[in-house]
Amino acid sequence: VCAVSKQPVGIDIERIGAYQPNVAGRVCSDAEQKLLEQCEDPARLFYRLWTLKESYVKLTGTGISVPLSQITFSFLADGRVESNQNRVQFASFPFGDGYWLAVGEKMR
């Protein structure tokens, strides 16, 4: 994957594996955990959330020293990603067979 931007970018790609509720309990916000509980396919949603969080920490360079549960994502009906992180825009989508890709980019 290649990204070209005048602003910093963070990218993450993960293979969709088994849903890990114990990990989700540590890294997902309360709102995200509710989404996972209501979801028909929690594994896909978990890895979508995970790649978004990873793209953010790669973008900022903070690593996982930031509590990932404080970075919250939600999804609009048209698939766009919303976040509580100001001045960052995100995109997330299936990539290849069985993978999620997420990109975060600082806004000007």
Predicted regions located by residue number:
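Core catalytic alpha/beta fold that binds nucleotide/phospho-ligands
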Residues: V1-R108
